Amino acid sequence: MPPLVFDIDHIKLLRKWGICGVLSGTLPTAAQQNVFLSVPLRLMLEDVLWLHLNNLADVKLIRQEGDEIMEGITLERGAKLSKIVNDRLNKSFEYQRKFKKDEHIAKLKKIGRINDKTTAEELQRLDKSSNNDQLIESSLFIDIANTSMILRDIRSDSDSLSRDDISDLLFKQYRQAGKMQTYFLYKALRDQGYVLSPGGRFGGKFIAYPGDPLRFHSHLTIQDAIDYHNEPIDLISMISGARLGTTVKKLWVIGGVAEETKETHFFSIEWAGFG
């Protein structure tokens, strides 16, 4: 399961730290909603490592499959949650009805249809003649919470793990993929003030922005780290990057970590025909 963030306030805080992620919440049965994605926010593994190593996040590891967790909690608390939701809906609808009726009375007073001497029976007749009750019922809405009531009950396995254990588990995925140095590329770019996002659609590991992606264009497509002293550049990958990068005016950036000095170095390839 990829790293996920479900809380809106946490997502706002992450953006201040230069981590934007990708919104992935959608309605599977309503394809038109895919344009307006919502929580959870899916992070890259590098984002989680950076947050964890800088003491900016409390990482919770869930070993069970999500479907099994949800099924167990739903069976255990389904009836209770249903009652809570219905009670909250009824209270919300009651408040909305009162607010709409008070608003309607204020408008009638403003245009002179009623005054302080108008009786409740007269007001009721006015409501019936104008179908006001039907209009109020049709305007009621359901307020959807930003956080899940069920996710709070998920029991994580990280309570018994030390900070070093969590770091080892996070780095283990990198060691298995043989791309341990890629995180050091990520860290070096973050240290230089870049904001990084997944770069798969442009043929890279990351795309790098000089600031907030809503304000700046990305000119860099970052590739996986390589041992540039001994490992050749994959020409097929470079050609693919050229085809994708030329259209959107992006440099093709490769880099790696020098074994002797442990310094991170970057090299860029700019395509002819920009503009």
Curated annotation (Swiss-Prot):
Family matches, as InterPro entries: tRNA_endonuc-like_dom_sf, tRNA_intron_Endo_cat-like_sf, tRNA_intron_Endonuc_cat-like, tRNA_splic, tRNA_splic_SEN34
Active-site feature positions: 209, 217, 250
A GO term for molecular function: lyase activity
SUPFAM superfamilies in the cross-refs: tRNA-intron endonuclease catalytic domain-like
Subcellular location: Nucleus; Endomembrane system; Mitochondrion outer membrane
Chief localisation class: nucleus
Topology term for the membrane: Peripheral membrane protein
Catalytic activity: pretRNA = a 3'-half-tRNA molecule with a 5'-OH end + a 5'-half-tRNA molecule with a 2',3'-cyclic phosphate end + an intron with a 2',3'-cyclic phosphate and a 5'-hydroxyl terminus
Keyword Nucleus: yes
Enzyme Commission numbers on file: 4.6.1.16
A Pfam family matched in the record: tRNA_int_endo
Keyword Mitochondrion: yes
Gene3D superfamilies (UniProt xref): 3.40.1350.10
Note: The tRNA splicing endonuclease complex is present with 100 molecules/cell.
Oligomeric form and interacting partners: Heterotetramer composed of SEN2, SEN15, SEN34 and SEN54. Interacts directly with SEN15.
Entry similarity comment: Belongs to the tRNA-intron endonuclease family.
Protein name: tRNA-splicing endonuclease subunit SEN34
Species, as recorded: Saccharomyces cerevisiae (strain ATCC 204508 / S288c) (Baker's yeast)
